[in-house]
Design a protein with these regions (language model features):
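Short, surface-exposed coil-to-beta transition loops
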Residues: 140-143, 155-156, 261-265, 278, ...
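Short glycine/serine/proline-enriched coil/turn segments at secondary-structure junctions
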Residues: 138-139, 151-153, 243, 258-262, ...
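A generic structural motif
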Residues: 132-136, 162, 254-256, 283, ...
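Solvent-exposed N-terminal domain segments of exported/luminal and surface proteins
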Residues: 1-156, 163
Length: 357
């Protein structure tokens, strides 16, 4: 039991007949390009603006000797994730009876904090993201543009949406914090994308120790499986999941007394090797568990990059789950470095309109 998280214990208690964890020897196979490791030898970056910003060697692991809770959060946000990315963005909301809602989309991204970006327009930015819905038909061509800076206090997130009904682009300042997108059906917030993203000012952050825990790792069977095989009642098909004993840095986020968020208390687990978030528990105001999230890691050797194959969010009240950002070997395959850098004109309101069409 010592190696299980509270979220995993809750899964066993809620689904005693179906939830299992297959434990394998630890492989510690994560890797990123050597350039990232070389740049990280200069030591820690600096947190600025009360932790809302970072100043340091672009492309490095910002805090290789992390000691503060937000160091771990920034390491996760700025970990290596490719350069000029092109890929799919499917999602599934699965009900207890096995029925589901599914959707699909396209995404392109420019990750500015990495050693291979030379474009001057990336200065001061984390990156830029564009997404377009392709399914279901009623939402087709609805699109989103997000530009994220390295200092949320000085330069807050900029977001725009394209509405295919009106054929207009408008600013979307509400796409942050606990904004609930229609696709997630209330199972995930804007700041839960990729584990955690965006401003950090609504929480008090604290370290909860470094421990060994069973975590979803090297899930190649899931990556190679037929999509129909992995989507089962209550949770993903655990036949395709594997867990290893992993060293994780645990960080708590507790809502400030003068702030609001539908996730008042969060416990985040950051993999010590890849620096990425690998699991999370969300608690309500009474500190009773609401959601358990897994972000199973896998080494993409062709890049190399060590990233989540999907994000699975399990809600205990409704017994529904959201599976999104699903990557697989056959469909929705990620291109980590496009043949040529993405044009900056793509990541503008006019570019969003062209991209949506």
């Amino acid at each position: 039991m010592a190696y299980l998280t509270e979220g995993q214990i809750a899964m066993f208690q809620t689904y005693p007949e179906t939830f299992v964890m297959h434990i394998y020897p630890s492989r510690r196979s994560c890797a990123v390009p050597n350039e990232v490791y070389d740049l990280s030898k200069s030591g820690n970056a600096n947190m600025i603006a009360d932790g809302e910003g970072v100043d340091g060697v672009v492309g490095s692991i910002p805090f290789p000797d992390a000691s503060e809770p937000l160091h771990h959060v920034w390491n996760h946000i700025l970990r290596y994730r490719g350069v000029d990315i092109v890929g799919g963005a499917p999602y599934y909301v699965v009900n207890p009876d096995g029925s589901m809602t599914q959707g699909a989309g396209e995404a392109i991204a420019k990750n500015c904090w990495n050693p291979f970006v030379k474009e001057s327009y990336c200065k001061g930015l984390q990156g830029m993201l564009m997404q377009k819905v392709t399914h279901p038909p009623r939402l087709a061509d609805a699109s989103l543009l997000v530009i994220e800076s390295l200092n949320a206090l000085e330069s807050p997130r900029k977001a725009w949406v394209y509405d295919p009904g009106t054929r207009r682009v408008r600013r979307a300042p509400n796409i942050a914090y606990d904004y609930l997108g229609s696709a997630s059906q209330g199972l995930s917030t804007a700041d839960s994308f990729d584990g955690f993203n965006g401003a950090k000012d609504r929480y008090n952050w604290s370290n909860a120790g470094t421990k060994l825990k069973f975590m979803p790792y090297n899930v190649y069977d899931f990556y190679n499986a037929d999509r129909k095989e992995v989507l089962t009642n209550f949770h993903v098909n655990q036949k395709y999941m594997r867990y290893e004993l992993v060293k994780v840095n645990i960080v708590r986020a507790d809502i400030k007394s003068d702030k609001r968020h539908i996730y008042p208390h969060r416990v985040m687990y950051f993999d010590a090797d890849s620096y990425g978030m690998i699991s999370e528990e969300v608690y309500d105001g009474k500190k009773e568990i609401m959601n358990y999230r897994e972000l199973p890691l896998m080494n993409f050797y062709d890049e190399p990059a060590c990233l989540a194959v999907h994000s699975a969010t399990y809600n205990f009240a409704t017994r529904r789950y959201l599976l999104n950002n699903v990557r697989s070997s056959e469909i929705d395959k990620i291109i980590w470095r496009a043949d040529k850098p993405h044009d900056i004109q793509l990541f503008t309101p006019n570019g969003l309109k062209r991209y949506a069409k």
